[in-house]
């Protein structure tokens, strides 16, 4: 089960996602992963707690993984149009957006692996996350157009390998987007006016993309803040780990109901 926490920068997404990852680790095997290349998860969890795997992805590692997974396939496609030297794959792997797009695929693979009952996704600040999700959606739609174009150029190719690869990429992208549609997104905000405004914009953008916010969480919530949140978390003081443990022990995350019952291992 993939559970993601989204919201503007500075509202405490890492703290909240860490708290509920810790809570879920008591119910089943759990992983927490960040899509922020400057993640602070290891500051919260210097070592993995029992039942919880902390996964941080570095940009160079994600680019290298993309090259290993898709490098030969990209070369096969490009060679149908012009001569390709080995360095071109390195260039593509380091291009803006490639590592970010492949990161979502890695997170989905983590959930699909069956190794974990819960995968908690600590997203980057809202602008970066919305760009990431839109990139994934456009990638899928772009591949759909590519297939139609390549069908017109089919006679040019000496092999059906190119069409097979593009179809394979399209199916992979479709699978990733389907998983995002099934993901339980929790919108984290604070009670200040700017955070509430941006939370409303995030919710609107999610709806526009066909994704759904499962619940809203008010972090560092004041008594006068409107009472329309699934969870209201007061402001705590202490170290990052102490705050995470206080939230985890005092507030229960409401998981979505699947097939008439709560999704639990």
Residue ranges and their predicted role:
Residues 22-26, 109, 204:
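Short, well-ordered alpha-helices that flank and scaffold nucleotide-derived cofactor binding pockets
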Residues 48-50, 174-265:
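C-terminal lobe/tail of nucleotide-utilizing enzymes
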Residues 5-6, 33-35, 122, 186-190, ...:
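Conserved beta-strand segments of the P-loop GTPase G domain that flank and frequently precede/overlap
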Residues 39-86, 91-94:
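P-loop NTPase motor core
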Residues 40-43, 62-66, 127-131, 224-225, ...:
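Switch/connector loops and helix/strand junctions flanking conserved nucleotide-binding motifs
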Residues 81-187:
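Phosphate/Mg2+-binding loops and adjacent switch elements
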Residues 1-5, 30, 117-121, 185, ...:
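Generic beta-sheet signal
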Residues 3-62, 123, 132-137:
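Walker A/P-loop NTP-binding active-site region of P-loop NTPases
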């Amino acid at each position: 089960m993939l559970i993601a926490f989204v919201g503007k920068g500075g509202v405490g997404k890492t703290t909240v996602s860490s708290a509920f990852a810790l809570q879920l680790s008591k119910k089943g095997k759990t992983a927490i992963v960040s899509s922020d290349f400057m993640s602070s998860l290891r500051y919260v969890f210097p070592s993995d707690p029992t039942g919880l795997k902390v996964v941080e992805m570095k940009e160079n590692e994600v680019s290298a993984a993309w090259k290993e997974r898709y490098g030969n396939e990209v070369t096969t496609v490009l060679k149908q149009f012009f001569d390709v030297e080995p360095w071109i794959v390195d260039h593509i792997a380091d291009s803006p957006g490639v590592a970010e797009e492949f990161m979502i695929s890695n997170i989905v693979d983590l959930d699909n692996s069956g190794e974990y009952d819960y995968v908690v996704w600590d997203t980057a600040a809202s602008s970066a996350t919305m760009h990431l999700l839109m990139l994934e959606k456009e990638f899928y739609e772009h591949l759909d157009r590519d297939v139609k174009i390549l069908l017109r150029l089919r006679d040019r190719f000496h092999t059906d390998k190119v069409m097979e690869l593009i179809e394979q990429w399209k199916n992979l992208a479709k699978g990733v987007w389907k998983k995002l549609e099934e993901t339980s997104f929790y919108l984290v905000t604070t009670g200040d006016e700017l955070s509430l405004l941006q939370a409303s914009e995030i919710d609107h953008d999610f709806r526009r993309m066909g994704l759904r916010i499962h619940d809203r969480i008010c972090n560092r919530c004041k008594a006068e803040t409107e009472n329309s949140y699934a969870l209201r978390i007061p402001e705590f003081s202490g170290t990052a780990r102490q705050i995470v443990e206080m939230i985890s022990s005092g507030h229960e995350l409401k998981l979505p109901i699947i097939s008439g019952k709560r999704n639990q291992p």
